Amino acid sequence: MHRYSYYKTAACTLNVSIGDPQANKEEILKCIQELDSDTQLVVFPELCITGYTCQDLFYEHTLLNSAKQVLFEIVEELPENLVTVIGLPLEIENKLYNCAAICFNHDILGIQVKTYIPSYNEFYETRWFSSASELKENTTFTYKNKKVPVSNHIVFKDTTTSACLGIEICEDLWVTIPVSSTHALAGANVLCNLSASNEIISKANYRRNLVKDQSAKCYAGYVYASAGPTESSSDLVFSGHNLICENGAILNETKTDKIIYGQIDLDHLNHDRLHYKTSMQDLFHVNYTTVEFTSKPIEEIEFDRYIDAYPFVPNNQDERIVRCLEILHIQAQGLATRLSKIHCKDVVIGISGGLDSTLALLVCHEAFKINNYDSKGIHAITMPGFGTTKRTKSNAQILMDLLHVSSEEISIVDGVNQHFKDIHHDPEVHNITYENSQARERTQILMDLSNAYNAIVVGTGDLSELALGWCTYNGDHMSMYAVNASVPKTLVRYIEIGRASCRERV
């Protein structure tokens, strides 16, 4: 796991017993025993040691003392090398706080305190809890004669992996500037939320988008663990909606299991943070405490993360068509603007019958419609060579006829054979010289025709080819305007299909 930068996280929902910390301790430990052995972080729901719906029982010192004692007992029984985040109420200097204890290797690393205490609609937490903003500076909590920091401005940095954890509690996410945002600015790349989010109509979808979008804004992983249906249903219902997201993508979401896992790619997140520097500019200048801990590297991993072979292609057909048409419009608008700026009404494009040149021709056609140009100004040139098949040649001609563009066929065979004689190359030797000579001959034809027509050459190469260097230097890598340069190969076909689908619907 360390070697591949993946950090395995889990979110758990408990069968909670209201006001019974001992019973909840057994449930927490049972869940931990069920975790996969390579799990590095587990997050439990808000106030899970007591239950979220204790209401005025939170005033009882018997419950509060029992909750604190149970926390100590859980810490002693935790397995090695597992960061465990547990919710409980804590009385500190005659005030009650909604807290999360961050535990590791039989120790409490710190106490994160809830900042935003809701008191609206179905929530009335201010009846019992104080905000972290009421904490005195440098407040601590004693465990084993050690002073543990208590704050809402703490991050927990693993010196072995590149994981840096930031914790927030339920409502802290739902406000204008979430606590996790300042955590991210302080370096946290794995954000955890202990929640007790109830169910009302459409709230699940809003919550899903909230967690997903926050992970994107913070360039972070986000582990969201919520209270489940065994909380009191006197006036609220909880479903245990757990989510694990990464940089705007949902890695896992509760279906039926009470435990979900997500492998967060820390290297990817850290790379994005280096790249998008403006998002990491801290304008708040909040003083943070960084608590360091050292985990053991996990060498054996069972990789179960889904990797999409077509990351740029939406699975939903309607969404895919909308995206592809949007891309086509962006391409066409770019070319249309360039043609308008240089006062040019003619383009030259090489057509092979393949995907890339087909898309480029469609882009030219759309651009000419935007500028209200005559499509005959699109000079589509087919240049058959030694390897041209009847099928690709036929496809190219059909497309050009359908679009009513100017078409012309120029064979490169004689020109390339003469070139082989000039450079003393045997045409029976099919090496790189044989291949590149044909590509350069085609480019020469296109460039010369662009001069003849007072036009520009439109390039057809796509992003994948450019990234891999899959083009001929001084050949098809050259053009005046390359419309496919930002389109990956896996998306090209779908843009063409999307345009065709749209035409059929109209």
What are these regions (language model features)?
Residues 261, 292-310, 373, 377-431, ...:
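A conserved beta-strand->alpha-helix junction
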Residues 47, 196-197, 227, 383-386, ...:
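Short, ordered loop/turn segments at secondary-structure junctions
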Residues 345-357, 413-416, 462-464:
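A glycine-rich phosphate-binding loop feature that marks nucleotide/adenosyl-phosphate handling sites
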Residues 217-218, 338-345, 366-378, 388, ...:
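Secondary-structure transition/capping motifs at alpha-helix termini
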Residues 114-117, 123-151, 160-162, 173-176, ...:
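Active-site adenylate/phosphate-handling loop in enzymes that bind or generate adenylated species
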Residues 1-350, 366-375:
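Enzyme catalytic cores with a strong preference for nitrogen-chemistry domains
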Residues 23, 69, 178, 206-210, ...:
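Generic recognition of stable, solvent-exposed alpha-helical segments in well-folded globular domains
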